[in-house]
């Protein structure tokens, strides 16, 4: 018989469960103390984008930063990977202030191929944030209802806790790193929650099949065997998906980066949590029922 990896030994799974809990606690501390780094779509502000004829040097970037911060102390300057794009992000500015800012900026950026100014007012940003949260909550509720109907109670509870972990772990990483959270981040969260559910279903279905096949065998052994049996399929899916999105992560630019980062991390977290959150909790549950 092929040798199996012991994923769910009592000591191993409990160590990983504790580490996972500690990580989420740390992440939530950052979330409640520092918050998330929301993009302009989720907070009022102005962004001036320039497509440049030639890359900026470090002195020009420093000058732009000083100019922007003379209007707002927390203004940021962001350049594209090829150096020929620049984003100046600042607070919400009235039209006359924007004209003064662009006038000062264009003393540094003399030649450019295109310019775009985006302004989000406070009321619009609040409305966007509320709608994004509502859409996410409704989607999560639908997923949870599906899980509850699809599985028996202990399987469903384990899957729901797993979904919560995937969500909180991803948010924790963005809170700690202060990577930008844009509307595409919400789409990524929903995508990776769907991925995590799918991964759960694959493993849980195999556990149910093996439980019927070996009714007298210890549940932890059955669960561990099921993970080993589905491991190759899971790894192939993870590797091919990550390989497909890696070029977008590297060369996709700042607009796509929050979405791709969330997907990238979520796939890894979702795969990990299927073993050490969903399956581990299920094993603990069954041991308590003995």
Swiss-Prot record:
Role according to the record: Part of the Sec protein translocase complex. Interacts with the SecYEG preprotein conducting channel. SecDF uses the proton motive force (PMF) to complete protein translocation after the ATP-dependent function of SecA.
Main localization (coarse): membrane
Any one Gene Ontology cellular component term annotated for this protein: plasma membrane
Cited Pfam families: Sec_GG, SecD_SecF_C
InterPro entries the UniProt entry points to: SecD/SecF_arch_bac, SecD/SecF_bac, SecD/SecF_CS, SecD_SecF_C, SecD_SecF_C_bact, SecF_bac
Cited PANTHER family: PROTEIN TRANSLOCASE SUBUNIT SECF, PROTEIN-EXPORT MEMBRANE PROTEIN SEC
Annotated protein name in UniProt: Protein translocase subunit SecF
Naturally occurring in which organism (per UniProt): Dictyoglomus turgidum (strain DSM 6724 / Z-1310)
GO molecular function, one term: protein-transporting ATPase activity
Family matches, as HAMAP family: SecF_B (MF_01464_B)
Membrane-spanning residues: 15-35, 131-151, 156-176, 184-204, 234-256, 260-282
Source taxonomy: Bacteria, Pseudomonadati, Dictyoglomota, Dictyoglomia, Dictyoglomales
């Amino acid at each position: 018989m092929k040798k199996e990896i012991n994923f769910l030994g009592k000591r191993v799974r409990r160590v990983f469960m504790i580490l996972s809990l500690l990580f989420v606690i740390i992440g939530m501390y950052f979330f409640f103390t520092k918050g998330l780094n929301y993009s302009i779509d989720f907070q009022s502000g102005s962004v001036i984008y320039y497509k440049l004829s030639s890359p900026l040097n470090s002195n020009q970037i420093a000058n732009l930063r000083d100019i922007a911060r003379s209007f707002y102390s927390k203004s940021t300057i962001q350049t594209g990977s090829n150096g020929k794009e620049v984003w100046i992000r600042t607070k919400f500015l009235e039209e006359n202030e924007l004209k003064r800012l662009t006038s000062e900026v264009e003393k540094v950026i003399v030649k450019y191929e295109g310019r775009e100014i985006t302004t989000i007012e406070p009321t619009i940003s609040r409305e966007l944030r509320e709608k994004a949260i509502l859409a996410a909550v409704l989607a999560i509720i639908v997923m949870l209802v599906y899980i509850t109907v699809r599985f028996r109670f202990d399987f469903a509870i384990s899957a729901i806790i797993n979904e919560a972990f995937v969500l909180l772990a991803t948010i924790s990483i963005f809170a700690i790193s202060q990577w930008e959270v844009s509307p595409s981040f919400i789409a990524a969260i929903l995508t990776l929650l769907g991925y995590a559910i799918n991964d759960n279903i694959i493993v849980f279905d195999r556990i149910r099949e093996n439980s019927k096949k070996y009714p007298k065998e210890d549940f932890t052994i059955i669960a561990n065997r099921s993970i080993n049996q589905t491991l190759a399929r899971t790894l192939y899916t993870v590797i091919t998906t990550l390989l497909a999105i890696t070029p977008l992560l590297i060369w996709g630019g700042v607009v796509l980066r929050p979405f791709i980062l969330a997907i990238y991390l979520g796939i890894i977290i979702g795969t990990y949590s299927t073993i050490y959150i969903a399956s581990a909790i299920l094993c603990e549950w069954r041991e308590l029922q003995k």
